[in-house]
């Protein structure tokens, strides 16, 4: 259930790297139990914003608070209890079973995370498909017990079956566990099915935010990307599809 109290608050976040302005006065909030997608063209600053939120980029002005705590200056260990970044992949795959990997990821929420991967728990990591591995990495982040999960393009480089599996685990996180997460994606259909609100970014700025099912989203996507988008609906689809034309 979404609560009114903000879990994550960004206020006027601006970031320079040298003379380049990567983020400009980004203000955004995520409520307890809410799931947010961040969408925008390449170079919009989406991944940069995620790196600020998880503490990998700290030279920003403005404020970033999680559960009322300013993240600037926090140790990475303390920050890991507040926010967890789900990687797209692991550079090295140890020969652990999925169960062993989740137990090593964190004891706090191990059983909860295992519920997301019940049919995979005895499989070894190197045997998993890209989609199955991404599902396990999401479960690993859940095991760490962070208040906010952050996902950067989780469906990149996966086939349709893997994409379906990732959507399923995101829905479980949202509907069954009640976790809050931020999802950066180019996949508008994924955002429609798996998030409550969508924020659009362009050239380092937040240009629009609103309910993911807001009818204004189609028009705002057209403005953001500079091309026309249309919404397609069908009785067999759980959510409409928005595509460029």
Predicted regions: what they are:
Residues 39-41:
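The feature captures the beta-strand-to-loop junction immediately N-terminal to the Walker
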Residues 54:
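Helix-to-loop junction immediately C-terminal to a conserved catalytic motif
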Residues 62-70, 79:
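Conserved ABC transporter NBD signature motif
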Residues 124-128, 132:
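Conserved ABC ATPase signature
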Residues 149-153:
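Catalytic Walker B motif of ABC-type/P-loop ATPase nucleotide-binding domains
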Residues 185-186:
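H-loop/switch region of ABC-family ATPase nucleotide-binding domains
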Residues 224-245:
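ABC ATPase nucleotide-binding domains
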């Amino acid at each position: 259930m979404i609560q009114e109290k903000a879990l994550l608050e960004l206020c006027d976040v601006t970031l320079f790297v040298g003379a380049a302005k990567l983020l400009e006065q980004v203000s955004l909030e995520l409520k307890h139990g809410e799931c947010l997608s961040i969408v925008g063209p390449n170079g919009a600053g989406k991944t940069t914003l995620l790196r600020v939120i998880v503490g990998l980029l700290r030279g920003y002005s403005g404020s970033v608070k999680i559960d009322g705590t300013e993240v600037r200056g926090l140790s990475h260990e303390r920050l890991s209890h507040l926010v967890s970044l789900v990687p797209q992949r692991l550079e090295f795959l140890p020969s652990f079973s999925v169960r062993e990997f989740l137990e090593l990821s964190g004891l706090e929420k191990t059983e909860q995370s295992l519920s997301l991967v019940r049919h995979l728990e005895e499989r070894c990591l190197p045997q998993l498909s890209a989609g199955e591995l991404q599902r396990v990495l999401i479960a690993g982040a859940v095991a760490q017990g962070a208040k906010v999960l952050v996902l950067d393009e989780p469906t990149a480089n996966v086939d349709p079956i893997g994409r379906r599996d990732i959507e399923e685990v995101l829905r479980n996180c949202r509907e069954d566990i009640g976790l809050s997460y931020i999802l950066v994606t180019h996949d508008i259909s994924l955002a429609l099915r798996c998030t409550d609100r969508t924020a659009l970014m362009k050239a380092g700025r937040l240009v629009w935010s609103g309910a993911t099912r807001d009818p204004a989203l189609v028009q705002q996507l057209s403005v953001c990307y500079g091309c026309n988008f249309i919404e397609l609906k069908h009785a067999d689809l759980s959510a409409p599809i928005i595509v460029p034309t």
